[in-house]
A protein has these predicted regions:
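Functional cores that coordinate and move charged inorganic groups
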Residues: 2-8
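Helical substrate-recognition/capping region of FAD-dependent monooxygenase/halogenase enzymes
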Residues: 10-258
Length: 258
């Protein structure tokens, strides 16, 4: 429902072409295939089809009494986890720039559902801070003087937020480098200047170590199934059909308290 709901809303508001709805099949068929796979494995475990499978099942049940790893084989919980959409068409894959670290140590990748973590500012949790109707940019930064890279990332994302006010908007959540945010920084493998772009259904659709406004605009255009022209000129963003729209004056973004 979340996957289809935000796409229908974007099309009805004129923020995306009808083609966005075609992505529902690609993304939900993947989830269905994953659920069928896990259900089949669970059924095979409950009713073994061979002597070897029965021996494995009985051994796991015996070990599960005393060992946690065996209990996870009995109840993996996989059917309660959101499906990763990694590799789907609406995502912007990583494209590290020269001199910038990659995301090799990150637990998340484009397509994965966002992870929660406590935040110092209201409402107190990362997922509760996300926009319920539009895209959200998570910007990891410190104080401007001590963290010029993170400060530039904030400026670039806020510029993109201003340009996107005419096309659905962009909420910006700044996550400062403080002890209360340590878990968020760790879960997102964040460094000063790291930016994650999240869809309305809370899936990661792009991420950067140092994003530009054009990066954010192009990634959102791709996530909305528009031709990702990005910025053709300063202050010019693609419209809902992927064509170049009229210049849009930069306006303040929607930002959470630092």
């Amino acid at each position: 429902a979340d996957n289809l709901g935000w796409k229908l809303a974007a099309v009805l508001r004129g923020e995306a072409p009808d083609a966005l709805l075609d992505s529902y099949a690609e993304e939900r068929e993947r989830a269905a295939d994953e659920n069928i796979l896990h259900s089949t494995r669970a059924t095979d475990f409950i009713t073994p089809k061979s002597a070897v499978s029965r021996l494995f099942r009985d051994a796991v049940l015996h070990l599960a009494r005393d060992h946690g790893f065996a209990r996870e084989l009995v109840n993996s919980g996989r059917l309660s986890r959101p499906t990763s959409l990694s590799g789907c068409a609406l995502l912007t894959e990583d494209a590290p720039r020269a001199g910038q670290p990659d995301f090799a140590g990150a637990a998340l990748c484009p397509g994965d559902p966002a992870l929660d973590a406590p935040l110092a500012q209201a409402p107190g949790w990362l997922l509760r801070s996300l926009s319920r109707t539009g895209f959200t940019a998570l910007v990891f930064a410190g104080e401007a003087q001590a963290d010029p890279v993170g400060h530039r990332a904030v400026e670039q994302v806020m510029q993109a937020a201003g340009l996107l006010q005419a096309a659905g908007g962009l909420a910006v959540v700044r996550i400062d480098a403080q002890a209360a945010h340590a878990l968020a920084w760790r879960r997102y493998d964040a460094r000063p200047g790291t930016v994650y772009l999240l869809r309305p259904d809370q899936h990661v659709c792009a991420r950067w170590r140092a994003a530009t406004a054009a990066d954010v605009l192009a990634a959102q255009a791709r996530a909305l199934s528009r031709v990702p022209h990005g910025l053709h000129a300063a202050g010019v963003a693609p419209d809902a059909d992927g064509d170049t729209a009229a210049p849009v004056a930069a306006r303040p973004g929607v930002a959470a308290a630092a």
